[in-house]
Amino acid sequence: MNRPPDAPRSQVPPSYGFHCVLPPQDFAQALVRVTAALKAEGFGILTEIDVQATMKAKLGIDGPPYRILGACNPPLAHRALTAEPDIGLLLPCNVVVREAADGDLVVGFMDPVAVMQMTSNPEVAAIAQEVRARLERVRSALA
């Protein structure tokens, strides 16, 4: 990662994803906005993991709000599964909504192009490009 040592974590994306910082709002509002923006690009939410609640329940650790949304675009997922049946090991696309240490609300998107590089299937690579374009539009709609 090319992050300067003093750069806030919420401002530099990892190589396996990309993100945006939301305008000020409460966490529940952010989840609604993210879900609606994903829906506008054809994604539904298959799973929602409340990491904050899980860490509290399992480890007794208090942490900031943090949700992992398992987003899926069924037609694109079907194409990928048809091209490579075991690609389900890399699905769905995770989208993280979290509160950063500086109080920013950050939305992180798994980069399907980076993740799907594990396969050498050109059809899967093309689908990953399409998924990334949709997720980038979601990011633009949220910023």
Which ranges hold each PLM region?
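Compact, glycine-rich, soluble single-domain proteins
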Residues: G44-V96
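Terminal, regulation- and interaction-focused segments at domain boundaries
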Residues: N2-E41
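Beta-strand/loop substructures that line and gate deep hydrophobic ligand-binding cavities in soluble
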Residues: V96-S120
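Short amphipathic alpha-helical/adjacent loop interface patches that line ligand
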Residues: L31, N73, R132-L135
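Short glycine-/small-residue-rich flexible loop motifs, especially phosphate/cofactor-binding loops
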Residues: T35, Q52-A53, E136
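Well-ordered alpha/beta subsegment
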Residues: Q117-A143
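Residues at alpha-helix termini
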Residues: A40, A57-K58, A141
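A generic structural signal for well-ordered coil/turn residues at beta-strand boundaries
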Residues: P14-Y16, P65, L91, G103
